[in-house]
From Swiss-Prot:
Pfam families xrefs: KOW (PF00467), NusG (PF02357)
Name of the molecule in the record: Transcription termination/antitermination protein NusG
NCBIfam families associated with the record: nusG
Species of provenance: Rickettsia felis (strain ATCC VR-1525 / URRWXCal2) (Rickettsia azadi)
BP-aspect Gene Ontology terms: DNA-templated transcription termination; regulation of DNA-templated transcription elongation; transcription antitermination; transcription elongation-coupled chromatin remodeling
GO cellular component: a single term: cytosol
Family: Belongs to the NusG family.
This protein's UniProt keywords: Transcription, Transcription antitermination, Transcription regulation, Transcription termination
């Protein structure tokens, strides 16, 4: 740190108190940096200074190669949340990890998140998780194209959805008559 130390900048009431801080990282390196941080904390016997290290992520269902897979998405890409006791030693430990570009706040004075700010982040995470859980790949009434099986290339309308079994009931026209057929999610694609 330059000129003043963190220990001298923080008010005495904030010393020895663990607060949430935001650390900016290189893009896509959040997991590696978190693992490196945990190793260094253990190696330097500083576990008392750190309470939690969090990469805010939520699960999303996506169709990849015709299969429904769960993927993690970052709520705040390139950021890690750390609940820590901010001292010169803990500041330097985090700051000197390769891929860490700095703390939120000024260059020499990291800014702790307020309770309302951290609560807002956790609420956003919870909302994203609920929205993702409730979101559907397909909707009743949506037009889809059959991509596999005896009805391949047929166009149909989604009539029912079974999220647990990843199956759809699709109405297709066979010889001019609407006929319902059951298909897996990976047997259809959206008609874009």
């Amino acid at each position: 740190m330059t000129e003043q130390s963190i220990d001298n900048i923080l008010p005495s009431s904030e010393k020895n108190v663990k607060q949430w801080y935001v650390v900016h990282t290189a893009s896509g390196a959040e997991k590696r940096i978190k693992e490196d941080m945990l190793r260094r904390i253990a190696k330097q016997k500083m576990t008392d200074f750190f309470e939690d290290i969090l990469i805010p992520v939520f699960g999303v269902s996506e169709v990849k190669r015709g299969k429904n897979v769960k993927v993690e998405k970052k709520l705040m890409p390139s950021y890690i949340l750390i609940k820590m006791n901010m001292t010169d030693k803990s500041w330097h430990l985090v700051k000197n990890i390769p891929g860490v570009t700095g703390f939120l706040g000024s260059k020499t004075t990291p800014k702790a998140l307020t309770e309302s700010e951290i609560q807002n982040i956790f609420n956003n995470l919870e909302a994203e998780a609920k929205e993702t859980k409730n979101s559907k790949l397909y909707e009743v009434g949506e037009i889809v194209i059959v991509t596999d099986g005896p009805f391949e290339t047929f166009t149909g309308t989604v009539e029912e959805i079974d999220q647990e079994k990843n199956r759809l009931k699709v109405s297709v026209s066979i010889f001019g008559k609407a006929t319902p057929i059951e298909l897996n999610f990976n047997q259809v694609k959206k008609n874009d």
